[in-house]
């Protein structure tokens, strides 16, 4: 498959803070395809209450909508999980979803997480043979100093950054500079 694969989208309508309805989801699909995306993985937020009952039906319809746009436009299903002590067990039991039935897990943390806690969570997931994809890596201030980013990568995780974090004037904005440096140095994988 050539083209962009977007592994972090809130495109299923009515599930969480993303798309409100199918019209909005279609517009999101069309815009993504026009920008070169050829595969989108829908990643609604994980809830300890379990999977939304309609999640698989919505994912199937999303696939149909993408196919109407172009035959080479594919979709998948996963979740943006929030790390908690029971996450690994929930993944094993199918109560939380990996990215399109792979070993990759899109996981986010509290922005104020300590590096020690973040590292321990990554180790717990990798020891269970999952590959954590840390969502919104730009939000974790504990990674701004030292070698934490490199250490996490060496541990086996992948890093995802929001495109919007690269926008703006990098000359004056320290956050934008940090984000751009991570991309330039090859530390951002998705």
Residue ranges and their predicted role:
Residues 11-22, 105-113, 166:
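Active-site mouth loops of central-metabolism enzymes
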Residues 51-160:
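Extended substrate/RNA-proximal surfaces in nucleic-acid metabolism proteins
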Residues 33, 126, 183-184:
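Non-catalytic positions within long, well-ordered alpha-helices that form the structural scaffold/packing
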Residues 1-72:
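An N-terminally biased module of ancient metal coordination in phosphate/nucleic-acid-related enzymes
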Residues 144-150, 170-180:
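Histidine/acidic-residue-rich catalytic or RNA/ligand-binding cores of hydrolases
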Residues 43, 186-190:
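Short acidic/histidine-rich active-site segments
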Residues 9, 45-46, 80-81, 137, ...:
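Active-site metal-binding loops of divalent metal-dependent hydrolases
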Residues 22-29, 87-92, 116-118, 178-179:
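Short, acidic/polar
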């Amino acid at each position: 498959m050539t083209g962009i694969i977007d592994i972090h989208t809130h495109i299923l309508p009515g599930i969480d803070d993303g798309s409100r309805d199918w019209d909005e989801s279609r517009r999101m699909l069309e815009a993504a395809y026009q920008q070169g995306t050829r595969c989108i993985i829908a990643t609604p937020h994980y809830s300890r209450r379990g999977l939304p009952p309609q999640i698989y039906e919505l994912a199937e319809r999303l696939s149909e909508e993408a196919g109407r746009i172009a035959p080479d436009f594919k979709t998948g299903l996963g979740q943006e999980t929030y790390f908690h002590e029971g996450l690994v067990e929930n993944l094993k039991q199918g109560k939380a979803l990996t990215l399109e039935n792979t070993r990759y897990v899109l996981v986010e943390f509290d922005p104020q997480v300590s590096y020690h806690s973040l590292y321990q969570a990554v180790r717990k997931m990798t020891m269970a043979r999952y590959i954590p994809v840390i969502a919104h890596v730009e939000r974790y201030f504990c990674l701004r100093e030292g070698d934490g980013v490199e250490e996490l990568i060496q541990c086996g995780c992948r890093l995802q950054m929001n495109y919007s974090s690269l926008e703006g004037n990098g000359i004056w904005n320290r956050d934008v500079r940090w984000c751009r440096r991570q991309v330039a140095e090859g530390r951002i994988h998705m």
